[in-house]
From Swiss-Prot:
Record PROSITE patterns: G_ENGA
Record's keyword annotation contains Repeat: yes
Keywords noted in UniProt: GTP-binding, Nucleotide-binding, Repeat, Ribosome biogenesis
List of residues binding GTP 2: 185-192, 232-236, 297-300
Designated name of the protein: GTPase Der
Domain EngA-type G intervals: 2-169, 179-354
One Pfam family linked to the record: MMR_HSR1
UniProt-listed GO biological process terms: ribosome biogenesis
Assembly with partners or alone: Associates with the 50S ribosomal subunit.
Amino acid sequence: MFTVAIIGRTNVGKSTLFNRLIQKPMAIVSDTPNTTRDRIFGIGEWLKRKIAFIDTGGLIAKQTPLQQLIALQVQAALSQAKAIIFLVSLQEQLNSDDFYVAKVLKKNKDKPVILVVNKAENFNPKTAEETLKDYYSLGFGRPVVISAAHGIGIGDLMDLLVKQNQLLPNENNDDLAKIRFCVIGKPNVGKSSLINQLVKQNRVLVSNESGTTRDAIDVPLKVNGEKFLLIDTAGIKRKGKINMGIETASYIKTKLAIARSNVILLMVDGSKPISEQDEVIGGLAQAALIPVIILVNKWDLVLKNNNTTNAYKKMLKLHFKHLDFAPVLFISVLKNQRLNTIFEQLKIIQSQLETKVATPLLNDVIQQAQLYNQPPLFKGKRLQITYAVQTKSQIPHFVLFCNDPKYLHFSYARFLENKIRENFGFNSVPISLYFKSKNARIRTKPEV
């Protein structure tokens, strides 16, 4: 996917622009410098073309321990980007940090840099040459003038990015397959060996040394006539230890791979206890809000009895509490055991993602659920759901209209979720329920 890194000094509006480009409030926006320390990824769309954006921390010339880490993360983002937005501010004069950023970007000679002047709400096109003359000194030509906060000039910027994308070799891998899945997990759980088994050839470096796979590699697959796209990533080390360039790059590549996927394979080592590191990686899978398959590898090394499998599943639920929808497959990559079940499960998930529930049937289930189990009282008032509908989304998404969302208890939301799962076969995918007042236009979160 065409990937663009947003680079600039502190407090020029990078996160505001990022949120505008992906049309979602993912990044924290603050007037405080260095608010964005970890990299944030999102996908925007313009003229039916998808573009991945990387939000980055502010680069400054002064080298502190924090700034050195941010610089490493920015370099990793630059290594993944195919184009760069260099963001500066019209509300402040250019300073030494802007020129420092320009110097860093000039080292990436093989990638186009678009100079963007932000915070230009009061920009007057009639005096453009006089206003912008200082920005030419950065060495990146005529700037694009925008206001990220007000949406001014964003269309022109997106047009430029689409043109840059068209100049690059065409990459169709994302569009070849309905199912795009990535494999994530801590280093040395067998991810690379799994991919080698699935594609029947050595596409990635395999070693007993922890963390030997560095790049995200797209592997188009065709199984029984079905097209899949497998996105391999490096194993994720503990986030606190991601302080060297190569591991920072691996972490970024993993999150980019997740952003491009519609299914995640979360791989754990069945011969070892679930670790805190596994739980952190499980949190990444949960946060993606897409289907997850848990692969328990090295199952051939486990001594078993009649209860071993069920006991392990219960243990997984304790460690991955919010992934209870995720199917669990017990495999051995080394012995090539039960690997075919991965593609079988992927097809089941795809079928569930494509399931559309007829509105009358959905409302019958919701009304019957309310008759069977009334919502609990909230300050003497009871929730009443009058209408429900499934809306288009990446995962099954249901909007439930009610008298007042504040009467909803989280346990009743979970009860309704389970009823929808039971009646319509959504047993292997996450689903989302939004509760709205009958007269409201915005989402209201349930009170817990």
